[in-house]
Swiss-Prot record:
Main location: mitochondrion
A Gene Ontology biological process term: carbohydrate metabolic process
UniProt similarity note: Belongs to the citrate synthase family.
Lineage: Eukaryota, Viridiplantae, Streptophyta, Embryophyta, Tracheophyta
The organism of origin for this protein: Citrus maxima (Pomelo)
Protein name: Citrate synthase, mitochondrial
Transit peptide: 1-18
Principal EC category: transferase
InterPro entries associated with the record: Citrate_synth-like_lrg_a-sub, Citrate_synth-like_sm_a-sub, Citrate_synthase, Citrate_synthase_AS, Citrate_synthase_euk, Citrate_synthase_sf
EC number(s) stated in the UniProt entry for this protein: 2.3.3.16
């Protein structure tokens, strides 16, 4: 059966690769299929020595190779675009968008197992891909699904820690407090205190990471129920997968909403290592802080208005358009409202990206989902109009490198359609999703023995004294 599944999937990929004249995709996929009979832990245990040797060889052969010049503009500009991190799980291309272990979002949708035929990829499949670089079988994904369900037990003191906060506290504050309380059970901290050898530290890191990934949807769902509903805990459904169960525990059982949550978690899981949340998690973990502490720090970065709060602000802005112009807003009215926003010194939320220079493929796959499941939704139709109206206006301004929509331009409208309309909560959904990418990389940080992060800083005085003016 395994060989039949592989042959069928390979046939699909060869057809797709032929259409795109890209044979490398099928070659890469063949490489990724080795050791398909092993469970997740066994695969990691087999891979890690090979990757450790690979890293040693890279350091030996290429350690002195230069990656580029750093200018003062880069130093005072947030290190934007500076290559300075090793991040194995994903890579962001300015034109193609994110690739998870070399696979684009459309390729992941094609190759990763789904809950139903032609459905969205299961987040467990992406987690397997991020950790191993291999496309899992449906049986492997089902096994990982069960493992995560078995790990998804949250102690009572976690709920009590959240309950100690006012209900009015921001959802991210309550979510972060719950994650902090989970840290009490850290296996990495216990192993470190007992003197675990550095070469084995990836194993308790893996245990913590899988426990954390399994439990954060439970904590997040409780935060939602506490703030917006009756405060009751909806138990997990052992027949459902990770994304489906998250939707269920939030109180949404529409099959289309379950599919949306699978897609949402998958595409929000990772976006290489330089964004605030990913970099923060990596930085804190480099001090040998356990995965709970590291992910908590990442969440606090994600809560910032310039990072994870953007998806919240998009829906609020779109609703403000409807409030002022009505649902049947004309193109001219929409142009006027966009200019009004820009002339007031604000940005149009959901457009532009620090790295991407084309439409975010995460936006595109959400648009395809909407066209399939909710083509007549008024807010979706408004988002479609914005796609036509906003980029030309931003291009005309001449100050924007990327006028195209990003992932945040669409997600709120989809969630709102199925009843999850509380925009203030959206960053929590983002946080749950990002646990997959951050924790996967933390395991590899420990497996590869990556060092403490310690860049050099300078003062304005130092710059003025030591740097000559550019010619």
């Amino acid at each position: 059966m395994a060989s039949l599944r592989s042959a069928t999937a390979l046939s699909r990929l060869r057809s797709r690769a032929g259409q795109q004249s890209n044979l490398s995709n099928s070659v890469r996929w063949l490489q990724m299929q080795s050791s398909a009979d092993l469970d997740l832990h066994s695969q990691l245990k087999e891979m890690i020595p090979e990757q450790q040797e690979r890293l040693k060889k890279v350091k030996s052969d290429l350690g002195k190779a230069q990656l580029g010049n750093i200018t003062i503009d880069v130093v005072i500009g947030g290190m934007r675009g500076m290559t300075g991190l090793l991040w194995e799980t994903s890579l962001l291309d300015p034109d193609e968008g994110i690739r998870f272990r070399g696979l684009s979002i459309p390729e992941c949708q094609k190759l990763l197992p789904a809950a139903k035929p032609d459905g969205e990829p299961l987040p467990e499949g992406l987690l397997w891909l991020l950790l191993t670089g291999k496309v899992p079988s449906k049986e492997q994904v089902d096994g990982l699904s069960k493992e995560l369900r078995d790990r998804a037990t949250v102690p009572d003191y976690v709920y009590k820690a959240i309950d100690a906060l006012p209900v009015s506290a921001h959802p991210m504050t309550q979510f972060a407090s719950g994650v902090m309380a989970l840290q009490v059970q850290s296996e990495f901290q216990e192993a470190y205190e007992k003197g675990i050898h550095k070469s084995k530290s990836w194993e308790p890191t893996s245990e913590d990471s899988l426990n954390l990934i399994a439990r954060v949807p439970v904590v997040a769902a409780y935060v939602y129920q506490r703030i917006y509903k009756d405060g009751k805990i909806i138990p997990k459904d052992d027949s459902l997968d990770y994304g489906g169960n998250f939707s269920h525990m939030l109180g949404f059982d529409d099959p289309k909403m379950l599919e949306l949550m699978r897609l949402y978690v998958t595409i929000h899981s990772d976006h290489e290592g330089g964004n605030v949340s990913a970099h923060t998690g990596h930085l804190v973990a480099s001090a040998l802080s356990d995965p709970y502490l590291s992910f908590l720090a990442a969440l606090n970065g994600l809560a910032g208005p310039l990072h994870g709060l953007a998806n919240q602000e998009v829906l609020l802005w779109i609703k403000s358009v409807v409030d002022e112009c009505g649902e049947n807003v004309t193109t001219e009215q929409l142009k006027d409202y966009v200019w009004k926003t820009l002339n007031s010194g604000k940005v149009v939320p959901g457009f532009g990206h620090g790295v991407l220079r084309k439409t975010d493929p995460r936006y595109t796959c959400q648009r395809e989902f909407a066209l399939k499941h909710l083509p007549d939704d008024p807010l979706f139709q408004l988002v479609s109009k914005l796609y036509e109206v906003v980029p030309p206006i931003l291009t005309k301004l001449g100050k924007v490198k990327n006028p195209w929509p990003n992932v945040d331009a669409h997600s709120g409208v989809l969630l709102n359609h199925f009843g999850l309309a509380e925009a203030r909560y959206y960053t929590v959904l983002f946080g749950v999703s990002r646990s997959l990418g951050i924790c996967s990389q933390l395991i590899w940080d420990r497996a590869l023995g990556l060092p403490l992060e310690r860049p050099k800083s300078v003062t304005l005085d130092w710059i003025e004294k030591n740097c000559k003016k550019a010619a």
